[in-house]
């Protein structure tokens, strides 16, 4: 699936479904433990120090930090132990009777799904966002709908398609972070 996606022989949606199919038949507790270990051992060490500093800065300024991502949420919860992230909104996996089916529950949280999921989350909490004072960060064209909502739109090590799509938008900037 990875090679097929890299060669553009399949869609991002299908590649994601294939990459997550290994979860089928695994218990919820097992998957969540594997996810936390993956996050701690693989993901957190790879975070850009500038990104971590930026999140901490925004939090210190009083911002409520939300992670809105196409990634599956089962392995991201451990980020809350390291970063000032209040909530994670991402791709949900289908669980039936405590067992992962390997299927995505609903839609992949990318593109227009990001602002839709945020709106659902806010409505469920009776909460609001001041988009005129908000910051959003992204790296791909799938982040453009979320970036477009916020006054401060930051493309981090962006793919060219995102820069083309957002070029000229008020509040749009590009940054390059490294390890």
Task: Give residue ranges: language-model regions.
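Alpha-helical membrane-targeting segments
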Residues: 1-22
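Electropositive phosphate-/nucleotide-binding environments in soluble metabolic enzymes
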Residues: 9, 13, 25, 111-115
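C-terminal cap/substrate-recognition subdomain and adjoining C-terminal extension
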Residues: 28-29, 33-36, 40-179
């Amino acid at each position: 699936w990875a090679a097929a996606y890299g060669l553009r022989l399949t869609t991002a949606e299908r590649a994601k479904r294939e990459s997550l199919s290994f979860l089928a038949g695994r218990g919820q507790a097992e998957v969540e433990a594997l996810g936390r270990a993956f996050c701690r051992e693989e993901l957190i060490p790879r975070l850009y120090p500038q990104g971590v500093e930026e999140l901490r800065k925004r939090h210190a300024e009083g911002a409520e930090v939300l992670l809105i991502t196409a990634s599956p949420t089962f392995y991201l919860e451990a980020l809350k132990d390291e970063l000032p992230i209040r909530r994670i909104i991402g791709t949900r996996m289908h669980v039936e009777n405590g067992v992962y089916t390997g299927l995505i529950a609903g839609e992949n949280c990318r593109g227009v799904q990001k602002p839709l999921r945020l709106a659902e989350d806010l409505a469920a909490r009776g909460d609001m966002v001041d988009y005129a004072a908000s910051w959003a960060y992204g790296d791909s064209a799938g982040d453009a709908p979320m970036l477009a909502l916020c006054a401060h739109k930051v493309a981090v090590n962006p793919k060219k398609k995102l820069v083309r799509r957002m070029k000229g938008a008020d509040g749009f900037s590009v940054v390059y972070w490294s390890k």
